[in-house]
Amino acid sequence: MIASTMDRAEVLRASTGDFPLQEVRVAVGGREWSVLHTDAVLSHADEARFLGDKKDRLPYGVALWPAAIALAHEVASRAGAFRGARVLELGAGTGLPGIVAASLGARVAQTDRQEVAMSVCRRNGERNGVEAIEYRLVDWAEWDDAERYDWILGSDILYGEPAHPHLRRIFESNLAPGGRVLLSDPFRAASLRLLERMEADGWRITMAKWSVGEDEARRAVGLFELAPPADANP
C-alpha cells in the first residue's frame, strides 16, 4: 500500500540548491512509514518521465524507487536475521531499507555519495522514530571502510557498469564470515550482467521476485541474495 500526502511541504536546503520534498506513506512489515523524497518513480512511465526531463535537476538518488520499497519488504520479512546484525546500506537514497533494518534491532550504517541523500536519510529516520543509524558520506571509488558486516544492502545500485569493480571490491572486503549481500533490482540489463559474472566466479545467488505499485503501474523487482565463494571469507 502506497499513499501520497502533501499536508505540509518541506524543502531540503543543500549546497547544490533547494529541493522540494514530498511525503509518501508506505506500508511495510505491519506498520506505515513516512518517507520524504523528491519524486516517486514507481512505474515504467514514471521512470521515462523522470529520466527524460532535462530541466529536472533533482538528484536521482533521493527519488523513491520501487527497488527500495521491495528491499524494505524483504528486510521486514527476515526480521529475525536482522536483529542484532551489523548492516551496511550502499547508495542509501531515501534510506527506507536501512531504516526498516534499524527498527528491527540491526546496527545500521547508511552510505551515499550525495550530501542531499544523507540529509534525507537522517530526516526519514527521525520522522519514523529510528535514530540509531550511522550516516557516512562516501564514494565507492574512494572506499576505505575496513569493517565487516553481516548484511550489505543495496536497492537499484547496479545500473552503472563503471561502478561494478568498486561494488565487487566492497562485497568481497566488507562481508563478515557467513555474511550476505541483499540487492533489489528491476532486472536492468547491466545489473544482470554483473550478477552473471559473479555467479561464474563462484558466488551463490538466489532470487525472489516482488511486485511494487498498483494495478497497471505495478513494477517487477528482483531480490537477489549473494553468498560469496566458500573461500572468500576464511
Residue ranges and their predicted role:
Residues M1-P234:
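S-adenosylmethionine-dependent methyltransferases
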